[in-house]
Each structure stands twice: as structure tokens, then as C-alpha cells.
């Protein structure tokens, strides 16, 4: 921990490490992160790291998680010119993904990751 200035720096590094693992498993698809396979992968990762995510969320680090997810999606999908209204698509998606994941993970007996991913994909596919 000597190389970090704060606890948050340590947590952000851990979040980034998980996102890099995700990047290595992503499916190549013209739809990018919005593809069905990558939505399923997203929810499987949320499920795999459920305790870690919920601990961070309940400790007040939800924005740190969301900001890192936003940065990750920007790095994968690219950014739009600041004058383009289309830039909001990415943030609509990441916000919906993260919020849905938190509510889903908070349930005592959450539905299967594939089921929530399928539901999410059907509802979000027009974004």
C-alpha cells in the first residue's frame, strides 16, 4: 500500500484490475459492449464479484465504481465529440447497467445472471 495515496486509490486499482480481466474475456462483436454476449459477460462478472461490489457500494464507493465503468466503456467504445448528443448513449447504458446490477445483486436470492442479462438486453437494445 506504500504506492497509494489513499484507500480509494487502492480500491480504484482493484476495480481497474477486474475491468481488465473483463476486457480479456470480451467477445469481438460489431455491437461492442452492447452485444448480447458482452451483456451476459457483464452480469456474470457482477455476480462473480458480488460481495466485493456490494461492500464497496454500501461503504460509499458507488461513484468510484461507476466512474471506472464509465472510463472503461469510453476506452472500449471511444468517445464522441463533446458537441454530439450521441455521447450520452454510453452513459445511459453504463448507468442502467450499474443500477440494475446493484438492485439485482442486493436481492437475497437474485435470478440467474443469464436471465437478468437477457431481460436487460431486451430492454436496452434500442439505446
Show which residues each predicted segment covers.
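Hydrophobic alpha-helical connector segments
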Residues: 26-52
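Short, structured helix-loop boundary elements
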Residues: 8, 12, 16, 32, ...
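An amphipathic alpha-helix adjacent to DNA-recognition modules
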Residues: 1-27, 47
